[in-house]
């Protein structure tokens, strides 16, 4: 039987000059220290593009192996792996939201991104095996195409043999040009893997390289800390979490998806997910992404700048009282918008139609009015539960129409008001997971000054897959996360 390992991946902050210092610590882990570079507002664009491009659009042992990882804007975590014999080094994003491993190929001749990053040369590897199957992966802001090959992958000093991966011969996105990473190492389920290539954790499992069939993330969100965090294959480091993990079963294989409950603002329900929403834990997403109807309420609660929607204000002004009266009369909320004439079908459409239809003036029409109406129903129904007066309810809905999240995802807040902002909490497995303002507000530099942005962005997915939350690095920074592929479950515990 092959020797089983606990593979530790140590994450550190980005350095323009990466002076590497390797040493074995008292706990048996081999760690890598990196210098760090303080980032500014200009880096947000690159991080945002990387985050958008990184979304795939598809229906305890004494042994340790170190890999230096980089924390880019506290949002993208990536590190160096080796490919081939002898190893050719590549910087890759460790992404739980996709499943393929790909790197630029030496046969990539016509994409600028390839010339700006390391390229894999099969002629220099004695362990290379040809495959040749062509493939293409489409992302949120571009695509890569190429062909499959097989070779050994070095993660730390652990060798995964004959891993199937993609040699990218074309990269059609500015994301890949400006990104500080060469490729992506997907950690999702094989169900979303292009070409049925096994994700690397599955190969580790089949080759009996792991102490346990799990991997775990600890992301250090402290911008002043020397370490960016740890990714551990085969176990979890008890120094990086407090108490026991709360586990939830994977509800749908592909992404690391589970059934989540409500989002609470200062202990009060936002209503939209009161009966449950799907959620995905995704290390490749920078922020927290969720339904527009909820993010608008979050924006209002924290004083974030937003987009004023004339369609929204029109619906509240002309139909708000009618919606309110129907809800008071116990009308099924899914039928309210069709009864007031703004939606064609009962419950056939959802707020999850896309934020563009709500705030983009160039996309007016019945779709926009229906989407706004459905949001208004959620807001008004939620306020009725709080026993608010009619005047307060309609005034609140009108205020939310001025706080709709920007389509580009960035919502600025006052840095001086952070201490006065409410706690937010996700309900998972009937337990509340609190995020403090210090945890969900992201600080960055712009012209020597600190700028604060909300960690929440609008991201609408229509039924049947939605509504959907994506819990990215903002959430994973607060909660140590275990991905248990042996038992198909996800665990959360407060980060230490």
Swiss-Prot record:
The keyword Disulfide bond applies. It holds the Pfam family SapB_2. InterPro entries: Aspartic_peptidase_A1, Aspartic_peptidase_AS, PEPTIDASE_A1, Peptidase_aspartic_dom_sf, Phytepsin, SapB_1, SapB_2, Saposin-like. Keywords: Aspartyl protease, Disulfide bond, Glycoprotein, Hydrolase, Protease, Signal, Vacuole, Zymogen. It is an enzyme of class 3 (hydrolase). Residues 1-24 form the signal peptide. One of its GO terms (biological process) is proteolysis. Its main location: other. Residues 25-59 form a propeptide. It comes from the Eukaryota. SUPFAM superfamilies: Acid proteases, Saposin. It is found in: Vacuole. Gene3D superfamilies: Acid Proteases, Saposin-like. GO terms for cellular component: vacuole. SMART domains: SapB (SM00741). Residues 307-407 form the Saposin B-type domain. Glycans are attached at residue 387. CDD domains: phytepsin (cd06098). Disulfide bonds join 108-114, 273-277, 312-401, 337-373, 343-370, 415-452. One of its GO terms (molecular function) is aspartic-type endopeptidase activity. Its EC number is 3.4.23.-. Residues 77-493 form the Peptidase A1 domain. Involved in the breakdown of propeptides of storage proteins in protein-storage vacuoles. Belongs to the peptidase A1 family. This is Aspartic proteinase. The gene is RAP.
């Amino acid at each position: 039987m092959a020797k089983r390992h606990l593979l530790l991946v140590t994450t550190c902050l980005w350095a323009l000059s990466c002076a590497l210092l390797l040493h074995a610590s008292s706990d048996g882990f081999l760690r890598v220290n990196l210098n760090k570079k303080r980032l500014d507002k200009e880096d947000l664009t690159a991080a945002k593009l990387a985050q958008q491009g990184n979304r795939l659009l598809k229906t305890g042992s004494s042994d340790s192996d170190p890999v230096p990882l980089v924390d880019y804007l506290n949002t993208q975590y990536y590190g160096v792996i080796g490919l081939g014999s002898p190893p050719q080094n590549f910087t890759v994003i460790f992404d739980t939201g996709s499943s393929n491993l790909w790197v630029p190929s030496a046969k990539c001749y016509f994409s600028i991104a390839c010339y700006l990053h390391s390229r894999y040369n099969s002629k220099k590897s004695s362990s290379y095996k040809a495959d040749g199957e062509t493939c293409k992966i489409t992302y949120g802001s571009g695509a890569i195409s190429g062909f499959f090959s097989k070779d050994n992958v070095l993660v730390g000093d652990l060798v995964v043999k004959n891993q199937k991966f993609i040699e990218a011969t074309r990269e059609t996105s500015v994301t890949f040009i400006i990104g500080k990473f060469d490729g992506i190492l997907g950690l999702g389920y094989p169900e979303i893997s292009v070409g049925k290539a096994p994700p690397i954790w599955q190969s580790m499992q089949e080759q009996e390289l792991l102490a346990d069939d799990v991997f775990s993330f600890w992301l250090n969100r402290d911008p002043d800390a020397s370490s960016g965090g740890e990714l551990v294959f085969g176990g979890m480091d008890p120094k990086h979490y407090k108490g026991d993990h709360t586990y939830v079963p994977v509800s749908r294989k592909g992404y690391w998806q589970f059934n989540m409950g409500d989002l609470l603002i200062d202990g009060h329900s936002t209503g939209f997910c009161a009966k449950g929403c799907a959620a995905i834990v995704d290390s490749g997403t920078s922020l927290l992404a969720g339904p527009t109807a909820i993010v608008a309420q979050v924006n209002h609660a924290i004083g974030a700048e937003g987009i004023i929607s004339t369609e929204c204000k029109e619906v509240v002004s002309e139909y708000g009282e009618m919606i309110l009266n129907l809800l008071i009369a116990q009308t099924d909320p899914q039928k309210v918008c069709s009864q007031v004439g703004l939606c064609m079908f009962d419950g056939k459409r959802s707020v999850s139609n896309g934020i563009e239809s709500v705030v983009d003036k160039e996309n007016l029409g019945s779709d926009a009015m229906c989407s706004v109406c459905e949001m208004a129903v959620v807001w008004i129904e939620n306020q009725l539960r709080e026993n608010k007066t009619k005047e307060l309810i309609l005034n609140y809905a009108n205020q939310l129409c001025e706080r709709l999240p920007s389509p580009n995802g960035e919502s600025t807040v006052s840095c001086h008001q952070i201490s006065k902002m409410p706690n937010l909490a996700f309900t998972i497995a009937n337990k509340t997971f609190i995020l403090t303002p210090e945890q969900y507000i992201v600080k960055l530099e712009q012209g020597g000054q600190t700028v604060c942005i909300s960690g929440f962005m609008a991201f609408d997915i229509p039924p049947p897959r939605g509504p959907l939350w994506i819990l990215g690095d903002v959430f994973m920074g607060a909660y140590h996360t275990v991905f248990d592929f042996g038992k198909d479950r996800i665990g959360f515990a407060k980060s230490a």
